[in-house]
């Protein structure tokens, strides 16, 4: 088994991305990261994605990741059992926040449960029409809002703008994923607003959201972000400006699951480098 496939397709990489995104939020708000929450996010992400990919039905097109999943379903089961066990222990440790964490877990489950080909889960495919915003909202909740709640950060105007900024970045990335998955969603009767739009309309929505992302970034620059922090904040948005054309024309698993997923954590990664090499 190639380690790079295990790292990306085994959901280790995306789990690390989630942790780095949370670290970025903690450090942006000048609070000490909660180690238990970071561990919870890592294992909860591993649980969610292992469950999601284990349920992913067969598709007609060739996919390197899907082939890997077929060949390693038993390994995904082990990853799921290990991660859900760790998540349960960490949920007990974080029991003061049990309600909000449980609600977040439920929202995440609903997203993946639509892949289960049995009633009542099939019904979920008909209502997740705002799939793009739904997924971006879950990521924003986990990586920005929950760190603020756990750290008891005041929901100031700057915090709200930062939350919107992160949502817009993630939403733009989700647009590309949903455009790629439109044929699979049609086959599986999953309602997907992006899949129903023409490419011209998708392009307008994509760059409109990127424009709002840059506007919110400038607003943060006027509210205490220094120039280095501002450049770190906008760098993934700059890369997304030049990534639209290739993203809609390729189905490369590495492009989507390494590059585009990595853009979600890029600001956090750069911020950590800034801290290590001030």
Q: What is the predicted function of each stretch?
A:
Residues 1-14, 58-79, 113-137, 192-204, ...:
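Interhelical loop and helix-boundary elements at the membrane-water interface
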Residues 1-47:
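Non-cleavable N-terminal signal-anchor transmembrane helices
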Residues 6-14, 20-22, 39, 162-172, ...:
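Hydrophobic alpha-helical transmembrane segments of membrane proteins
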Residues 15-20, 79-86, 134-146, 207-215, ...:
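Core segments of transmembrane alpha-helices
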Residues 19, 23, 41-55, 84, ...:
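Central hydrophobic cores of alpha-helical transmembrane segments in multi-pass inner-membrane proteins
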Residues 20-40, 87-100, 141-164, 216-229, ...:
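Helix-coil boundary and interhelical linker segments in multi-pass alpha-helical membrane proteins
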Residues 32-36, 80-118, 204-253:
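Transmembrane helix-loop-helix
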Residues 44-62, 170-193:
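Acidic (Asp/Glu-rich) catalytic motifs at the cytosolic membrane interface
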